[in-house]
Amino acid sequence: EGIRAIAQRIHSIAALLEKALKQLGFEQLNKQYFDTLRIVLPDTVTTQEIRTIALSKEVNLYYAEDGQIGISIDETTNLAALNKLIAIFATAAGKSPIAIESIATDSQLLPIHTRQSAYLTHEVFCNYHTETEMMRYIKQLERKDISLAHSMISLGSCTMKLNAAAEMLPLSQAGFMNIHPLVPADQAEGYRELIHNLSEELKEITGFAGVSLQPNSGAAGEYAGLRVIRAYQESIGEGHRNLILIPA
């Protein structure tokens, strides 16, 4: 029920935004959508005007090369954010904003696109409805597992990594976690400074010529390592070597 409610709310906000933008003179191209709108600007409004107004309100939008604008709604979008988006386009069009005071359930999906069958019917998804119940269930699973806290474990690039609570805590803070991967570069200067400083420190500690922080998993790290080894072999004329001995 919770997942359905979240999905319905996301779609309803997108539908409300589409309705408001149409009243302001903007065209929405996606005939069927769940959370994403594609807006065509009228001749009286330019992309640069929208961008300037949006940035002044600390809002980033997707600006396509053809001049269209993309907007995606998610579960964090609230009434304040919805009205801010509407105000941006209203200001650019020289019209009064349309205030949305409540989020009513309004579906623009055709019946053919709505799911009729049940989903997530396994008892695991149906028996735990509170945070306490879920935490106890996860703890029960944890007790069945073997970890570094109990004994030696087999080699694993993911399981060998340990993040202390002090390291994970900052990741839950808004200044670190609320960043979109496609944010303009000038809005991510702090991240670039963190990445640069950490890379330089690791280079000094290890003596490596360079360090990459891009791999985000053990598998990605192993692949990156193999690529480095491959590049080294090619640099010394041994690019024909293509066999890897992996310890069991």
Name what the model sees in each region:
Residues 79-154, 158-166, 171-177:
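Flexible inter-domain linker/hinge segments
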